[in-house]
From Swiss-Prot:
Keywords: Lipid biosynthesis, Lipid metabolism, Membrane, NADP, Oxidoreductase, Peroxisome, Transmembrane, Transmembrane helix. CDD domains: FAR-N_SDR_e, FAR_C. It comes from Bos taurus. Residues 485-515 are peroxisomal. This is Fatty acyl-CoA reductase 2. Gene3D superfamilies: NAD(P)-binding Rossmann-like Domain. It is found in: Peroxisome membrane. It comes from the Eukaryota. Belongs to the fatty acyl-CoA reductase family. The gene is FAR2.
Amino acid sequence: MSMIAAFYGGKSILITGATGFMGKVLMEKLFRTSPDLKVVYILVRPKQGQTLQQRVFQILDSKLFEKVKEVCPNVHEKIRAISADLNQNDFAISKEDMKELLSHTNIIFHCAATVRFDDHLRHAVQLNVTATQQLLLMASQMPKLEAFIHISTAFSNCNLKHIDEVVYPCPVEPKKIIDSMEWLDDAIIDEITPKLIGDWPNTYTYTKALGEVVVQQEGGNLNIAIIRPSIMGATWQEPFPGWVDNLNGPSGLIIAAGKGFLRSIRATPMAVADLIPADTVVNLTLAVGWYTAVHRPKSTLVYHCTSGNLNPCNWGKMGLQVLATFEKIPFERAFRRPNADFTTNNITTHYWNAVSHRAPAIIYDFYLRLTGRKPRMTKLMNRLLRTLSMLEYFVNRSWEWSTYNTEMLMSELSPEDQRVFNFDVRQLNWLEYIENYVLGVKKYLLKEDMAGIPEAKQHLKRLRNIHYLFNTALFLIAWRLLIARSQVARNVWFFIVSFCYKFLSYFRASSTLNV
């Protein structure tokens, strides 16, 4: 019997960010392994035209929860959706709901965050720092609370090369940042943002670092742990390989490359692609929740959930495997044939952006205008290039994350728990995982039927032929213009033609003599 699964039986659990990618995988694992848990509270932002119960059914109406419905048929009755807005004071939770949360909650998994790299600092501080502070205040009023698990990111201290499992201080105290966001206007915040974030590449990583400091400073006597996952990708094993439902992380790049939009990216092929499957993160999270509640560590422990130190895979190897998978399971209606390359400097990056990204988009939009349709490709391509520029920092560097606490926790688990809640990334086969990832993107994100693969392959063959014809025509036109304008080019052309004619004449004469 799994000790971790038994621990969550009968518990009342609060999950923030339950409608997000990790939140859904976390709920699925909880209900599948501990169907006898009491209730899962989820904070849900109200949507016009949808009741809270409809939001619950919308979450459960996914292939992800198929196994859960078999082991826990009344799962919809065990999910208690509470209307909340993390942008508001006290999350705009009603008095009745707040009373219920404070009275019954045993475990908190704080997964909610804004993950937009280009988010305005005010909004990023509100969701990643202030909301964490308010949730800690709520937690301090929960008499039955056993553990508070805060999900951060392995890149919260990406301004360092080597990162230990500790909370690092920030140059400016979080309280000062929170206070300043309340009275500064947007124009001033925009002006001071670069100075505030300093060596951090964006507001996301900076505010996640601030959030960790808040957890450490204001946790009081709570049993708290911090988990730092790296780049979260599709599921590895549970509940099945390849499940993904958002465009964050590599998923958006896989679609852009598979559809032929992404042709070049500035990245270091030998840099470590620190990708971590979502189910690995969830297994570690549940194990940490159990350990924190049962063993009650004296200080806040930080757990790194990364792959680079234990089972590294670089961007070059990953890119080749993704392209190889496209040959077997191509995406439908591709814009161009998948063929993405790495560049390593600004000059080649700008060149390929102009030639392989912007130029085809402009040509296609011109064609759309001629046929009376609305142009859209240039706008889409500009959005892709903005995304690539925000990712450059992360795909051109490698980090070293210590994993002492994570390995310690693994050694504390029984063989049964190590099997049921497996977070040992050393067992991960990258080639198999990436193939399942691409397949998952096709099935669960793009909603493409596997029966359409033969037609998708035929479409790629047509695109290949068009590519060859276009390049040949372009070469002939360029050469013709060059011959018309340059005596040197004409001389070279006549020399080549003369040489070929003489060679063919010699070959014909030799063949006649042999006969």
